[in-house]
Amino acid sequence: MNFVDRKAELSFFNHILHREHPGPAQFIILYGRRRVGKTHLLRHWAKESGIKHTYWAAEKESAPNQRRKLFAKVDNRTVAQSPLFNSWAELWEAIAQVIGQERQILILDELPYATDGDPAMLSALQHAWDQHFQHSQLILVICGSQVQSMETLQHRQSPLFGRFTGQWFLQPLPFHTLKTFFPNWSAAERVAVRSIVGGIPAYIQWLDPTKSLVENIQKQILFPEACS
C-alpha cells in the first residue's frame, strides 16, 4: 500500500521521538476502526524514525504463546528459541532487561487480543512501566481496533490510567487525498467513491485508478469475490 497524507499523525509521532517531557520514555495509545491504516502508519513512522523498532501483533491464542512470540520479537530470536514465561510480569521483567537504556520503539498491535487471553496483562504492564520503562529510553506504543476497549484503557478504572503520555484516534483519510489515488477521475467520481468506501485506505486500495468508477463498482463491489 502506498503511503498517502497522514501529515498531522506523522508530525505527532515525530514530535514524540524528540520529546523530553514528562521524560524520554513515552507511552502512546493509537486506536481507530479496522482497516483505517493504523498498522501501516506505525510501521511507516517506525521505519522512517531511524532508530531500532520492534512490531508485534497479538493474536487470538493462549497467553503463554503470546508472551513467547512477543519476547522472540523483542530479543530478535525465533519463537522456538524463546523461553516460556509463566506470567506477563515475568515477561515484562525480561523485556526490560533486554531493552535496557537503548532508545527504541516497541509497538504492541491488537492489544485487546492479549488482554482477552489474560486480563492480568494490563496490571503487569502498568507495573513494568512504573518500575522500568518510564525510566528508560523506550517509546512504547499500544494499538487496537476495538475502539471501546481501547478507550476503556484510558478510564480511571484502568490499570494504565495516568500512564499515557500521548493518544491519537485515527480517522479515515480526508477527501482531498482521493485525488492522489485517482488523479484522472472527475470530482464527481471522487465524491461518489468517498460515499462508498468512506476514506478507508484498505478499501481504496481495492479500486483500480486506471478504470472508471462504474467499472470498479462492477468488478469490486457487485462481485465481492474479486476482493477476496
Regions found by a protein language model. Name each.
Residues 1-228:
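Phosphate-binding site recognition
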